[in-house]
C-alpha cells in the first residue's frame, strides 16, 4: 500500500508528556518504501514416509510437506488435506502438525475428497525458512473400520489463495 501526508491538516500529533499539539511547519521529502509480493511453495519432504504400516495402527504419519514463503511472512488460515485409496472411506482421526506441534482440530480425512483444517492464526510462515507440515491419522477408515492388508494410501495437502495473507503486504499468494 502507499500513503502520503501532503498538508499539516492531514495529521495531528500530540506530545503525550505535555499533552500539547505539535505544529507541523515544513514538509520534508521522503523515499518510498516497497514491500515485495508474497509467494508459497509446497513440496513433499525428502523424509516423507513411504514404508508399510500395521493394520489398525494409531497416530501414523502418512506424509510430510515443506512449506516455504517468499517475499513476505505468510499467514495460512486453512489447509486442505485429502487421502486416496481405492475402496477406502477416508482416514480416521486425521490431524496436522506444524513443526511438531498440532494445529487445527482432529477430524477424519475424506477419501477422494477434501477435508479443511481451520488454523486461524496458528500458522504464520517466516519468509525464507522451511516449515514442515505432517499429516497423521489412524490406519483405519473414517468409520473406524480396519483397512485391508496391502492397501495403498496417498495423502496430499493444498492451500487456497483465499486462505492466505501476507503479514506486512496483505497480499494473497
Q: What is each residue range found by the language model?
A:
Residues 1-173:
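Exposed, polar/acidic Ser/Thr-rich sequence context and nearby capping/turn residues
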